[in-house]
From Swiss-Prot:
Other notes: AHL-mediated signaling mediates quorum sensing in many species of Proteobacteria, regulating hundreds of genes, including many that code for extracellular virulence factors.
Protein's gene: quiP
Gene Ontology CC entries for this record: periplasmic space
GO molecular function, one term: hydrolase activity, acting on carbon-nitrogen (but not peptide) bonds, in linear amides
Family named by the database record: Belongs to the peptidase S45 family.
Record-given protein name: Acyl-homoserine lactone acylase QuiP
Gene Ontology terms describing biological process: antibiotic biosynthetic process; quorum sensing
Subunit field text: Heterodimer of an alpha subunit and a beta subunit processed from the same precursor.
Catalytic activity reported: an N-acyl-L-homoserine lactone + H2O = L-homoserine lactone + a carboxylate
Extent of the signal sequence: 1-26
Protein keywords: Hydrolase, Periplasm, Quorum sensing, Signal, Zymogen
Keyword Translocase: no
Length: 824
């Protein structure tokens, strides 16, 4: 049986961090962490599979430096060290990607497994692996042997969350690393969650009012034509399993398995730097908590050295520095998948779907679920010409509508090779050549060498015959089908721009009306706007770049003040405030006065920042809750979830859309307008603040509302009330619009949900150009000294220098080392 805590865990199920300790779902009891489960930091140990001795040193962060005489031995050791630090994460991500969580979690995980079997990441991974070069396959094989050397040596000393779950880990296969890459790619699928949410919202408000709730930048037309695709469809009753699918997708997105992953990266050209040499900055943002999926690694082998960000299970450095080139990645928010509504007819065990006026038999295959505590379950997965019919419930598709997911195929994709080649690129020019071969994942790649900077969009983007892909399209009509993919030479790029800097922060990076469609689900523009402000403010260096990464000033506050002062708003808003009951009127006036004086700095100790964020929360409820509520409804949850992944209706309405039907409060007989709702929101912000922070408004602090909760996604830790897995919550500043990002759920709670998990800066003017930090710890094992040891340095902005020159290794990593020798 699954543990009783599982039902509370599932709403946060699915991310790499969550999967890290999924194995403790068995409900075991855990004592203190066993140091025998931790890789030693020193000594000499034989290891079968090595050709020559390998040295592993660690810095104070726990980051390993692997020194070897051959690249083969370096990869083998990387597999061994990755497993030693993050074996729970690796196993959990693999089972999640395979759709096999119910083997350890029981029946409560079946819905997640059904969805993941439908998505079929194993097929994508197989295509990627088969398309890889023999060289790359050898690398993955050697890495897998290193993982398996750990699994064999520590078979009786695995971390407690793994060992006591009643699960015997299978050995790692080379293809499993391609599966981890496919899972990473799936985690960037912003639009899948949004398309499901759009159907839920359409059920509530109808197709006519749906366009106002879709992610649309202020300078773009609302997508009424896109919403018209749903007109005439009985969405409430005909779409099989929609509520289940949306609920599971929300659970997956809650911890970064669908669309939440964000990031910022930028490069400063020599003419903008104090030294006359380039700088590159990167931070990768994931849901807050223990532990981040990202960790650092450094490898030195003959003809190969690299330091940077890695994900355990994948023998690639995805963002890093090789001594000549620095590269980083951020989420494009690309839309390279589509949902299709399919008309389904069932006759006995035979399922057909409508395609251009004809009923066509659906392809099918069997899936077997080995459920812990139960009998095996065999179910059929059906596929149309667009892809598999998504399913999260035991109910097979019947007559009506079902949803098929179409994704690009990767049969000839060389992305895995390209990432390895990128880590060896000597300059920006070569980085462009290799990154254009990265087609399996949509990224903003930013590069820098000492003299040049560059930006390249990667991925495979479909050419849609009609429609934008914002909403599910009628699958029975071929006019919405894909017509190949955009040529990678058409992908946006830039090199050494006149302005002297390049930046990507999930914003729309292309002008309106660009010749190819990347997305309609862009992130908020404010982080990119703030980068532009600071990059243009003067010459940059390491110190100013650190300050940029920790900057907590939002440009959204200034935009809000502009709206309040606009000629058509200033007087009506004052009149609306004056018309409020006395208590509300006084509160609204106070809020208005303070917000107009607010400097936009969202520090944890700021009273005005607390008021500002209270206003944002209350305005969302005042605008939308009457139509989409209650707050527990699927429609409201869909609105809140979408605001965490893309530019939201909440922001869009505050800054514009004065003619939106949502300004009217449908629960009152009169018709409200925008000034009336803004006045109510101002008053409600103070009222809500009084209830949460007390009546002394000057004593309010944003950090008393907004907290970093350093809790493990490990369900066992939750059963035990925290214990060794968790760390104390701490006050946080910033929000989803600040460079030091700290997003919360807009329309729900104030707890920090997203935070920078790994930061990297490369300043080419320095003797040792690279510095970095992670926000939690290098290890996922609480028995390790490197579990959660980076929280305090992360809070204080204490970066670590990461030396690439051998003469500086001792200063960065010390003298202590673990020596691994060839075993017999």
């Amino acid at each position: 049986m699954a543990s009783p805590a599982l039902r509370h865990f599932l709403p946060r199920f699915g991310a790499a961090a969550a999967a890290a300790s999924f194995l403790s779902l068995a409900g075991c009891q855990l004592g203190g962490g066993d140091p025998e489960t931790v890789l030693p930091a020193s000594g000499t140990f034989p290891l079968k599979g090595l050709a020559q001795n390998v040295s592993v040193r660690r810095n104070n962060m726990g980051m390993p430096l692997i020194e070897s005489s051959t690249y083969h031995d370096a990869l083998f050791t990387l597999g061994y060290v990755h497993a030693g630090d993050r074996i729970g994460q690796m196993l959990g991500m693999r089972l999640l990607a395979q759709g096999r969580l119910s083997e350890v979690a029981g029946a409560d995980a079946l819905e997640v497994d059904r969805l993941m079997r439908s998505v079929n990441l194993k097929r994508n991974a197989s295509d990627l692996y088969n398309a890889a070069s023999p060289r790359l396959k050898r690398f993955f094989d050697v890495y897998a042997r290193g993982v398996n050397a750990y699994l064999f040596r520590y078979r009786d000393k695995l971390p407690a969350d793994v060992a006591r779950a009643g699960y015997t880990p299978e050995y790692w296969k080379p293809e499993d690393s391609a599966l981890i890459f496919s899972l990473l790619n799936f985690s960037l699928s912003v639009n899948l969650q949004e398309e499901l949410s759009a159907l839920v919202l359409a059920q509530k408000v109808g197709a006519d009012k749906l366009a106002w709730l879709l992610p649309t930048y202020p300078d773009e037309e609302l997508p009424f034509a896109e919403a018209d695709k749903l007109k005439g469809l009985n969405l409430s009753n005909q779409v099989t399993g929609l509520s289940d699918l949306n609920r599971i997708a929300l659970q997956l997105s809650d911890l970064n398995m669908l669309g939440v992953a964000a990031s910022s990266n930028w490069a400063i050209a020599p003419q903008r730097s104090r030294s006359g040499k380039s700088l590159l900055a990167s931070d990768m943002q994931l849901p807050a908590g223990l532990n981040s999926a990202w960790s650092f690694v450094q490898i030195r082998a003959p003809k190969y050295q690299v330091s940077g960000a890695s994900i355990a299970g994948l023998p690639l450095v995805l963002s890093g520095f090789n001594g000549k080139l620095a590269w980083s990645m951020s989420n494009v928010k690309g839309d390279n998948q589509d949902l299709f509504l399919e008309k389904i007819k069932r006759e006995g065990n035979r399922v057909s779907y409508m395609a251009d006026g004809k009923w066509v038999p659906a392809a099918s295959h069997q899936e077997t679920f080995l459920v812990k505590g139960g009998s095996p379950i065999r179910e059929t997965v059906y596929e149309t010409r667009h892809g598999a019919l998504l399913n999260a419930s035991a109910t097979p598709p019947g007559n009506g509508l079902s949803l098929a997911l179409q994704v690009p195929d990767f049969k000839d994709d060389k992305s895995l090779d390209a990432f390895f080649d990128l880590s060896r690129a000597p300059n920006v020019e070569k980085a462009f050549d290799t990154s254009r071969e990265i087609r399996a994942i949509t990224l903003n790649m930013v590069f820098a060498d000492a003299s040049n900077i560059g930006w390249q969009v990667t991925g495979r983007f479909p050419n849609r015959r009609e429609g934008q892909g914002l909403l599910p399209s009628p699958g029975w009509d071929g006019k919405y089908d894909w017509d190949g993919f955009a040529d990678s030479m058409l992908h946006p790029y830039d090199q050494d721009p006149r302005q002297g800097w390049l930046a990507a922060a999930n914003q729309r990076t292309i002008p309106k009306g660009y010749g190819m469609q990347l997305s309609n689900s862009w992130g908020y523009p404010e982080r990119a706007e703030r980068i532009a402000e600071l990059a243009n403010s003067g010459k940059q260096d390491l110190r100013s770049t650190v300050a940029m990464q920790y900057d907590q000033t939002t440009t959204f506050a200034a935009k809000l003040k502009t709206i309040f002062q606009a000629p058509g708003m200033s007087k009506p808003l004052k009149q609306a405030i004056d018309a409020l009951p006395e208590a509300d009127r006084n509160n609204a006036r106070e809020a208005f006065t303070r917000l107009m004086a607010f400097d936009g700095k969202l520090s944890a100790t700021s009273a005005d920042a607390a008021l500002y964020e209270l206003f944002l929360q209350e305005s969302a409820k005042q605008i939308f809750l009457d139509e989409l509520g209650p707050e527990t409804s699927p429609a409201w949850q869909a609105l809140v979830a979408n605001a965490s992944s893309s530019y939201s209706p909440q922001a869009d309405h505050l800054l514009g859309r004065d003619d939106s039907p949502y300004w009217d409060d449908v629960k009152t007989p009169q018709k409200e307008d925008k000034p009336a709702i803004l006045a109510r929101s101002l008053a409600a912000a103070v009222t809500r603040g009084d209830s949460l922070l007390g009546s002394d408004h000057k004593a309010w602090q944003w950090g008393k509302l907004h907290r970093d909760n350093w809790t493990s996604a490990n369900p066992l830790a939750r059963q035990l009330g925290g214990g060794e897995f968790n760390r104390s919550a701490s006050a946080a500043g910033g929000d989803h619009t600040t460079l030091n990002v700290s997003g919360f759920e807009w329309g729900k709670g104030f707890d920090a949900r997203v935070a920078p998990s790994l930061r990297m800066i490369v300043d080419f003017s320095l003797v040792e150009p690279m510095t970095g930090m992670i926000n939690t710890g290098q290890s996922g094992n609480p028995a390790s000294p490197y579990y959660a040891n980076s929280i305090e340095p992360w809070q204080k902005g204490q970066y670590m220098s990461i030396p690439l020159q051998q003469q500086n290794y001792e200063k960065g990593y010390g003298k202590q080392r673990l020596t691994l020798t060839p075993g017999k």
